[in-house]
């Protein structure tokens, strides 16, 4: 039996010296140390030994088991180290290769235009004012010299929540709130979302953005308004941009005007974008109506002011030559990543 045990040790050593994988190593372990392994089979025959031989053979068997277990563990560690090295060689990193570029977010074209408008007017000393989008009828209409029978109050144009509360149709209510709570001089712009019951098409949306401006002080004139709008147009659309004013009517300003800029695409010679007119309407403006000043507790005999308002979507469409407003809201990455 001693010869059998020594033979098992020699045979196991030979096989362990040539093992190449973890799977082969496991097969060797089972072959010699498993429940039906060769070493286990020899130990089962110890019952036939004499009492004197059993301790000697038992000690030898335990030494051989311990030796085989130790060699298996050594071989396992070597194989793991070898496999790790081979994996690193296969997956070598070329540090000279360019890295994977991450997708970075960009500003939405509407945000770009709003920020540009803010920068222009902040540079002229204006402050930013904001107000609620869910507004009282008084601030949205009455305080702006729009009586209850005025067409602008038609339910077809306005989203009413109840008879006294609505979604603001313009950012003008912010101007009223500022004039109520601040004494002149006042110099503000009011950017924000507004709501009107319009069908969605290439140039209309029930939700859109406006930026309105207000200046109230002693001695403010129409000339100040024209100069301000000229600086704004040149800053936003380029130094060669010209403006023109056409008489118009707004309930909250008097006199009032629609303001056009020379076409940014053709420079005023006429093209498809400006419908061959050379001019594109961008905003409405005028001198603040005396009744509006009075409602806010400002004496129109002492103070005067001007106001203006423009649609951000249409300005962005002109700024970036976009021909359909709906593109601004469809969240198509192929479109938005151009800006």
From Swiss-Prot:
Binds 2 magnesium ions per tetramer. It is found in: Cytoplasm. It catalyses: tRNA(Phe) + L-phenylalanine + ATP = L-phenylalanyl-tRNA(Phe) + AMP + diphosphate + H(+). GO terms for biological process: phenylalanyl-tRNA aminoacylation. Mg(2+) binds at residue 254. Its EC number is 6.1.1.20. Keywords: Aminoacyl-tRNA synthetase, ATP-binding, Cytoplasm, Ligase, Magnesium, Metal-binding, Nucleotide-binding, Protein biosynthesis. PROSITE patterns: AA_TRNA_LIGASE_II. It comes from the Bacteria. InterPro entries: aa-tRNA-synth_II, aa-tRNA-synth_II/BPL/LPL, Phe-tRNA-synth_IIc_asu, Phe-tRNA_ligase_II_N, Phe_tRNA_ligase_alpha1_bac, Phenylalanyl-tRNA_Synthase, tRNA-bd_arm. One of its GO terms (molecular function) is tRNA binding. The keyword Metal-binding applies. Its cofactor is Mg(2+). NCBIfam families: pheS. Belongs to the class-II aminoacyl-tRNA synthetase family. Phe-tRNA synthetase alpha subunit type 1 subfamily. Tetramer of two alpha and two beta subunits. This is Phenylalanine--tRNA ligase alpha subunit. The lineage of its organism: Bacteria, Bacillati, Bacillota, Clostridia, Eubacteriales. The gene is pheS.
């Amino acid at each position: 039996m001693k010869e059998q045990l020594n033979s098992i040790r020699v045979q196991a050593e030979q096989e362990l010296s040539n093992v190449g994988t973890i799977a082969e190593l496991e097969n060797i372990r089972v072959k010699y140390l498993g429940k039906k392994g060769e070493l286990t089979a020899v130990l089962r025959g110890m019952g036939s030994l004499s009492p004197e031989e059993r301790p000697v053979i038992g000690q030898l068997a335990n030494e051989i088991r311990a030796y085989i277990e130790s060699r298996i563990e050594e071989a396992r560690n070597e194989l793991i180290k070898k496999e790790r090295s081979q994996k690193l060689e296969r997956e070598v990193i070329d540090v000279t290769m360019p890295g994977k570029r991450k997708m970075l977010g960009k500003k939405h074209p509407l945000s770009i235009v709003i920020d540009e408008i803010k920068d222009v007017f902040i540079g002229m000393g204006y402050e930013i004012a904001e107000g609620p989008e869910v507004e009282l009828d008084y601030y949205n209409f009455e305080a702006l010299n729009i009586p209850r029978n005025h067409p602008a109050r038609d339910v077809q144009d306005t989203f009413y929540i109840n008879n006294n509360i609505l979604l603001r149709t313009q950012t003008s209510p912010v101007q009223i709130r500022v004039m109520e709570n601040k004494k002149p001089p006042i110099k503000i712009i009011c950017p924000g979302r507004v709501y009107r019951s319009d069908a969605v098409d290439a140039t209309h949306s029930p939700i859109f953005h406006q930026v309105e401006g207000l200046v109230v002080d002693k001695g403010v004139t129409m000339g100040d308004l024209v100069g301000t709008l000229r600086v704004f147009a040149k800053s936003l659309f380029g130094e060669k941009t010209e403006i023109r004013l056409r008489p118009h009517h707004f309930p909250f300003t008097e006199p009032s005007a629609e303001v056009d800029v020379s076409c940014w695409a053709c420079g005023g010679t006429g093209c498809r974008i400006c419908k061959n007119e050379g001019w594109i309407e961008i905003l409405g403006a005028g001198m603040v109506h005396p009744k509006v000043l009075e409602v806010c507790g400002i004496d129109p005999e002492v103070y005067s002011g001007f106001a203006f308002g423009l649609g951000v979507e249409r300005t962005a469409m002109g700024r970036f030559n976009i021909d359909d407003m709906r593109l601004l809201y469809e969240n198509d990455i192929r479109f938005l990543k151009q800006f």
